[in-house]
Regions:
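Preference for intrinsically disordered or flexible, low-complexity segments
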Residues: 4, 40, 133-136
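Domain-scale recognition of soluble eukaryotic interaction modules
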Residues: 70-206
Length: 206
């Protein structure tokens, strides 16, 4: 699990006084209030109740489980008769905020509470705007497997992909199936970094 530092706890008390940190259970809970504006769109104000569970995080390269405990987001999806995925939330109230493989891209120095709260409030602004106006304020992330496929197919993410052993292993499986022979992970990593055509061949191979 991950424990919030004293400086993180102090920061939370100053900027998000409606949240409480339970150090024994490694949870943050309470109300998150925001007032935000994006470009020339209207200001959105709102508040949602949350539990943020840090207990399953193995380190700061992981992301906490974030649950909307007043069910406002699920209720909005039901009211609009839209899939929960459109509101980036699962049936148990857990928010879909980030693909695990994108953590190094958005949290370059690892998880910290200040960046997380900005991330969460931006997420809530998006959800609130979508609920109010039936339009995305900016293009939303894909959900679930669709998001993973979109991420992996984008060569701009190659440095993150090849430095993630699980993702690199998937490319080795594709390489073995396509060419009928094995390849060392380090060799495959170097080839993928220098040969975009190989990357595209493996991504598009069936």
């Amino acid at each position: 699990m991950v424990e919030l530092t004293l400086s993180e706890q102090t920061w939370l008390k100053e900027y998000y006084p409606e949240l409480s940190y339970d150090s024994s259970n490694h949870k943050l809970y309470g109300k998150v209030s925001f007032s935000l504006r994006y470009e020339d769109l209207p200001v959105n104000k709102g508040s949602y109740d949350f539990d943020v569970d840090f207990s399953l995080m193995k380190g700061r390269s992981d992301f906490p489980c974030v649950y909307n405990t007043d069910h406002r987001i699920i209720d909005a999806a039901k009211r609009k008769r839209k899939p929960l995925a459109d509101f980036h939330i699962d049936s148990d109230g857990k928010l879909c905020m980030i693909l695990p493989c994108k953590m190094p891209q958005f949290y370059t120095n690892g998880f910290n509470i200040q960046e997380f709260m900005t991330h969460l409030c931006n997420h809530l602004y998006w959800v609130s705007h979508y609920d109010l106006y039936d339009k995305e304020p900016w293009p939303g992330e894909k959900h679930g497997n669709e998001a993973l496929i979109e991420y992996v197919k984008d060569y701009r993410n190659i440095n993150l992909i090849v430095n993630d052993k699980k993702q690199l292993e998937l490319f080795r499986v594709l390489f073995n199936k396509k060419y009928g022979k094995g390849i060392a992970l380090n060799k495959l990593k170097n080839r993928l970094l220098t040969d975009e055509s190989l990357f595209k061949e493996l991504i598009n191979w069936k």
